[in-house]
């Protein structure tokens, strides 16, 4: 297909001996890395995205004779993950508690054939290294797009309406209407621009339409003309020309080498003073200190999102302490509904893997050593 092109290291990977795209016969060692549920693990039977829930596939895998190991311990040479790298066949991880799969780890993983992301976004994997090794990398495309788009809309409203200071007043026994109202705004009539209009970006634009906003979008490709007309969104080919027009900017582009650090001090300075930024894409798309400085200076009136770099965010991460933020841990795409969708998607791909069948084409990030074009 046109979307697949050989990665630069693909021929090298083939020369070194690529890994099988489909499973060979016999029992497989499958390792899952998820966040720990702890005291919350047994509070909801559908809470399958945690270590204890294990995506709800343990009984199914073990009934087929496979070995399934699940952990949240993923960092360092003495981690639980590291103990299993050399002989695991499949690694399942998640953007919400990512196991960073470096070229070094791929080199150690002699039996590794398949890397699955339970959710969307596989930038925790060194994709060129995976391609060079002939691996397959796939994710559950579409599994949490609604979840993330809804969360983005929520954060836009939280920041525009200056909700968080009001909430804090109530918690601390205070009452000062002026301290909230002096910078609270309606969403109606504002110009909202999304950087990226893929599945999540389009869903956000559709949800913004009833608010009577002026909607702009920037992407490599224009969305379908009929949908564009239905939503009432205008395409902006030049990102830097779009930014000064926007009262609200939402980041919906994947993290690639082209987008890493995309929003630096200079680009943020091109935005309208007092802009609201929402980023549920990836933290590394932003220059961390530039965002914190812009929030402190007032160039950015509010910054919200659930993505950080690195993750989990260290205690001294500047975004924890910058003014006017609406930051949370990485939660937008791991609602219970999303967990059930991406758990089902992982099970489906594992079943296809065991049977030697292809995955849904949209799920592939690297297919048998070939990197999807958008990650080139």
UniProtKB/Swiss-Prot annotation:
Q: What is an example of a GO molecular function annotated in this UniProt entry? A: NAD binding
Q: What is its EC number?
A: 1.17.1.9
What span is annotated as the signal peptide, if there is one? none
InterPro entries membership: D-isomer_2_OHA_DH_cat_dom, D-isomer_DH_CS, D-isomer_DH_CS1, D-isomer_DH_NAD-bd, FDH_NAD-dep, NAD(P)-bd_dom_sf
Does the record carry Oxidoreductase as a key word? yes
Q: Where does substrate bind?
A: 120, 144
An example GO CC term for this entry is:
mitochondrion
Q: Which residues cross the membrane?
A: none
- Once renumbered to this chain, the transit peptide range reads 1-20
Q: Give the location in the cell.
A: Mitochondrion
Q: What catalytic activity does the UniProt entry give for this protein?
A: formate + NAD(+) = CO2 + NADH
- A biological process term (GO) from this entry: formate catabolic process
> Which UniProt keywords are given for this protein, alphabetically ordered?
Mitochondrion, NAD, Oxidoreductase, Transit peptide
Residues bound to NAD(+): 145, 199-200, 219, 254-258, 280, 306, 330-333
Q: Does the keyword NAD apply?
A: yes
Q: List the disulfide bonds.
A: none
Site positions (Important for catalytic activity) = 282, 330
Recorded hits in PROSITE patterns, A to Z, give: D_2_HYDROXYACID_DH_1, D_2_HYDROXYACID_DH_2, D_2_HYDROXYACID_DH_3
Oligomeric form and interacting partners: Homodimer.
HAMAP family given for it? Formate_dehydrogenase (MF_03210)
Sum up the protein's function in the record's words: Catalyzes the NAD(+)-dependent oxidation of formate to carbon dioxide. Involved in the cell stress response.
Q: Which family does the similarity line name?
A: Belongs to the D-isomer specific 2-hydroxyacid dehydrogenase family. FDH subfamily.
The protein's name: Formate dehydrogenase 1, mitochondrial
Q: Which organism is it from?
A: Oryza sativa subsp. japonica
